[in-house]
UniProtKB/Swiss-Prot annotation:
Localization of this protein: Mitochondrion inner membrane
TM region(s), chain numbering: 12-32, 48-68, 92-112, 117-137, 142-162, 176-196, 247-267, 279-299, 307-327, 330-350, 376-396, 419-439, 463-483, 494-514, 591-611
Protein origin, superkingdom: Eukaryota
UniProt protein name: NADH-ubiquinone oxidoreductase chain 5
EC top class named in words: translocase
Gene, per the UniProt record: MT-ND5
Length: 612
């Protein structure tokens, strides 16, 4: 084996061993110490991050494209299934970022969940969640990818429903599973089609063998899978509902694991899509609709976690647009930069919520730049990075995506929606900054504000460095397969920045204006549309089940019971026997003359018959 390949393989196996050791310890009969979460789980992730830097530095210094390590797992007559790990610039760059972000989240969780009696189990779930995502990222075949895919799905169910004493948490966990089941159907159907027509689940072999095949059907299945997992329009309601889970779960779910898995699947499969206009157009339109719709929903939310959740869905829509542009490397760049500031925004939200007696309504916050200056600073940096402020992490990916959209020969509808959504991003980001950090406090004076804890400060500090410099570092080291357009008109170059500034100014004006309310209620229709999340949950969770139940009741009670069973059962027999019974009963009228006449007629007939 080549030394470089040996280095990659041994690093990955060592990383998995370090992460799996704390999990295996939990299966023993020995009770875990109270500090197991910080001494084992957090340390394991930190060590794995440091180990992952070795293959990353080697990869960047040697300029290698990809290394694959395979072990035969199962051999059948038509299909070989291998345990195969792929080291390319997607997995090599993403794994350290995922570990870095998770390390910060786990350290924060030691403070956030310190009073939970089952904190060790919580950390075990988080660690399993991370391992499943790393399996998905490093998989070189669809079967192995599917194991990671299902792993993040089931762990999200357990983590979202962590506080299972609350009905809302159970409902949210069930929603996450059911919506993801729809996506899983797409992935399974796509895998079945590929196994039938290509006879391989190995990613490289699929790319080679499928060149002369029409790949529309399996690609539609993969897009459905990504729609469910990455909460695209139509299968998106589970994502804001998932905020019922603890804040560290939300941070991990939205930054570097669950929701980016769908986009990562499409990035992995992008060579299958690059010549399929149906799939690319569908991704483009679906992403544009998602980013616009969820940004609109975020405008009027008052729950700080739900605003950040909708911003995630909006950014996932932007990544889907990028895949529709046939620029998967830009989508990957946005995944990497987005992980830093999105995790930081959630951790800041968790810090604020804990400091204000579990208050999540931004209207009941304010003035935190005096009381919690570090958290407020990180919240501001994260919101500005999300907006695409120049030279913060989000700028490098977001600006490149909108430039690519501006210079592509695609429909202007997607471009328009994306630019409006970018402006809306600036509006709700500034709204969070304005209501949470600025002005005067609007909460009870007894709130135990305390950010002077290393378990709060250190994770935020690390993620803030990532939010400031992460975009530049990833941008300098990522290999862009396609050369971007190097010349363009100034108005196109400045379009993303212009709409962001416009959004910021609009938000500032609106926030200042609405600090004194002139009307009793806002404009009913647009406000109601945004607050009710576009009426999608009402239609999917209320109208459709109500229609199904009503239809079922009508079929069961009226059509089957009152119509079919009545007409063919008791009533049918009664209707058949009634004429005969009526004719028979008419003959017995109680008149002696009639009876004597009938008797005589019968006697005559019998005599005649016997005589013959």
């Amino acid at each position: 084996m080549h030394p470089t390949t040996l280095m990659y393989t041994s690093s990955l196996l060592l990383m998995f061993a370090v992460l799996l050791y704390p999990l295996l310890v939990t299966f023993t009969s020995l009770p875990l110490n109270n500090d197991w979460a910080s001494s084992h789980a957090k340390t394991a992730v930190k060590s794995a991050f440091l180990i992952s830097l070795a293959p990353l530095s080697l990869f960047l210094s040697t300029g290698m494209e990809a290394v694959t390590s395979s072990w035969t797992w199962m051999v059948t007559t038509t299909l070989d299934i291998t345990l195969s790990f792929k080291f390319d610039h997607y997995s090599i760059i993403f794994i350290p970022i995922a570990l870095y972000v998770t390390w910060s989240i786990l350290e924060f969780a030691t403070w956030y969940m310190h009073s939970d009696p089952f904190m060790n189990r919580f950390f075990k779930y988080l660690l399993t969640f991370l391992v499943a995502m790393l399996i998905l990222v490093s998989a070189n075949n669809l079967f192995q990818l599917f194991i990671g895919w299902e792993g993040v799905g089931i762990m999200s169910f357990l983590l979202i429903g962590w506080w299972h004493g609350r009905a809302d948490a159970n409902t949210a966990a069930l929603q996450a599973v059911l919506y993801n089941r729809v996506g899983d159907i797409g992935l399974i159907l796509g895998m079945a089609w590929l196994a039938t027509n290509v006879n391989s689940w190995d990613i490289q072999q699929m790319f080679i063998l499928s060149k002369n095949l029409d790949m529309t059907l399996p690609l539609l299945g993969l897009i459905l899978a990504a729609t469910g997992k990455s909460a695209q329009f139509g299968l998106h309601p589970w994502l804001p509902a998932a905020m019922e889970g603890p804040t560290p779960v939300s941070a991990l779910l939205h930054s570097s694991t669950m929701v980016v898995a769908g986009i990562f699947l499409l990035i992995r499969m992008s060579p299958l899509m690059e010549n399929n206009q149906t799939a690319l157009t569908l991704c483009l339109c679906l992403g544009a609709l998602t980013t616009m719709f969820t940004a609109t929903c975020a405008l009027t939310q008052n729950d700080i976690k739900k605003i950040v959740a909708f911003s995630t869905s909006s950014q996932l829509g932007l990544m889907m647009v990028t895949i529709g542009l046939n620029q998967p490397q830009l989508a990957f760049l946005h995944i990497c930069t987005h992980a830093f500031f999105k995790a930081m925004l959630f951790l800041c939200s968790g810090s604020v919520i804990h400091s204000l007696n579990d208050e999540q309504d931004i209207r009941k916050m304010g003035g935190l730049h005096h009381l919690a200056p570090f958290t407020s600073s990180c919240l501001t940096v994260g919101s500005l990075a999300l907006t695409g402020t120049p030279f913060l992490a989000g700028f490098f990916s977001k600006d490149a995506i909108i430039e690519a959209l501006n210079t592509s020969h695609v429909n202007a509808w997607a471009l328009t929606l994306t630019l409006i959504a970018t402006s809306f991003t600036a509006i709700y980001s500034l709204r969070v900054i304005f209501f949470v950090t600025m002005g005067t406090p609007r909460f009870l004076p007894l709130s135990p504000i305390n950010e002077n804890n290393p378990a709060v400060i250190n994770p935020l500090k690390r993620l803030a460095w990532g939010g400031i410099f992460g975009g530049l570092l990833v941008m300098l080291n990522i290999n862009l397969f396609k050369t971007p357009v190097l010349t363009m008109p100034a108005e196109l170059k400045l379009a993303a920045l212009a709409v962001s500034i416009l959004g910021l100014l609009t938000a500032l004006e609106l926030a200042t204006l609405t600090s004194k309310q002139f009307k009793v209620t806002p404009l009913r229709t647009p406000h109601h549309f945004s607050t009710s999340l576009g009426f999608v949950p009402a239609i999917i969770h209320r109208q459709i089940p109500q229609l199904s139940l009503l239809l079922g009741q009508k079929i069961a009670s009226q059509m089957v019971d009152q119509t079919w069973l009545e007409k063919t059962g008791p009533k049918a027999i009664a209707n058949a026997t009634t004429p005969l019974a009526s004719a028979t009963s008419n003959m017995q009228q109680g008149l002696i003359k009639t009876y004597l006449t009938l008797f005589l007629m019968t006697l005559v007939l019998v005599t005649l018959i016997s005589a013959t």
